[in-house]
C-alpha cells in the first residue's frame, strides 16, 4: 500500500471527518457535533495548510491536523516548540491497518525538519479506550484541563510524545 499525505484537499478532509463523525454518532461514541465540522470552524490562520489527508493507494483514508501554534488548547506552549495533532479520523474501511502509526511517522518527520522533538494531543478524558490507544503509540498522559469549543465543554486529557 502506497501512502501519501496532502494538505491541499479541504473537501476530502471535511468529507472524511464528517463520515467518521457520523459513524461515531451512529455507534453512540460521539466525539464531535457534526454541525461544527465546517470549513469556517476548522480552517483558520493556525490550521491553514496544516489539515492533512492521508491517501492509501490514492484513496482518501484518514485526516489529521498538525499545527505549530494553538492558542485555544496550548496557549501556554511556545509557538514552534511542539507539533499539535487534532481531528484524527480514519475511515472505517481502513480500520485495523495501523494507519495511525504512519500518521505519527509523518508527523515526527515534519517535526524533525523544524528541530521539534515533541508531539502533543488532547482527547476526551472520559474515553479510556482511546487513551490506551494513544499510550500504545508512545504518548504519555500529562495533565487534564477543561476546554470550551464550539459551544461544548470538554474535560481534555493532554498527552505528549517525545523523541
Where are the regions that the model predicts?
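Short alpha-helical
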Residues: 11-12, 60-61, 128-129
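C-terminal "cap" of GNAT-fold acetyltransferases
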Residues: 82, 117-120, 124-128, 135-137, ...
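A short beta-loop-alpha structural element at the N-terminal edge
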Residues: 2-16
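Acetyl-CoA-dependent GNAT
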Residues: 18-93, 101-106, 110, 162-163
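Conserved glycine-rich acetyl-CoA-binding loop
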Residues: 91-105, 114, 125-132, 136
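Hydrophobic adenine-recognition pocket in adenosine-nucleotide-binding enzymes
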Residues: 8, 88-90, 123
Amino acid at each position: 500500500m502506497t501512502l501519501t499525505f496532502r494538505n491541499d484537499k479541504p473537501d476530502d478532509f471535511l468529507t472524511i471527518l464528517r463520515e467518521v463523525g457520523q459513524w461515531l454518532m451512529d455507534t453512540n461514541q460521539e466525539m464531535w457535533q457534526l454541525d461544527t465540522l465546517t470549513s469556517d470552524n476548522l480552517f483558520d490562520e493556525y490550521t491553514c495548510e496544516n489539515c492533512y489527508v492521508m491517501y492509501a493507494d490514492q484513496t482518501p483514508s484518514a485526516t489529521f491536523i498538525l499545527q505549530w501554534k494553538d492558542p485555544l488548547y496550548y496557549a501556554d506552549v511556545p509557538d514552534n516548540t511542539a507539533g499539535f495533532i487534532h481531528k484524527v479520523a480514519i475511515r472505517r474501511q481502513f480500520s485495523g491497518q495501523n494507519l495511525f502509526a504512519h500518521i505519527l511517522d509523518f508527523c515526527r518527520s515534519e517535526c524533525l525538519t523544524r528541530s521539534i522533538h515533541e508531539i502533543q494531543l488532547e482527547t476526551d478524558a472520559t474515553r479510556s479506550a482511546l487513551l490506551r490507544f494513544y499510550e500504545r503509540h508512545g504518548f504519555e498522559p500529562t495533565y487534564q484541563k477543561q476546554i470550551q469549543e464550539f459551544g461544548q465543554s470538554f474535560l481534555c486529557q493532554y498527552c505528549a510524545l517525545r523523541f
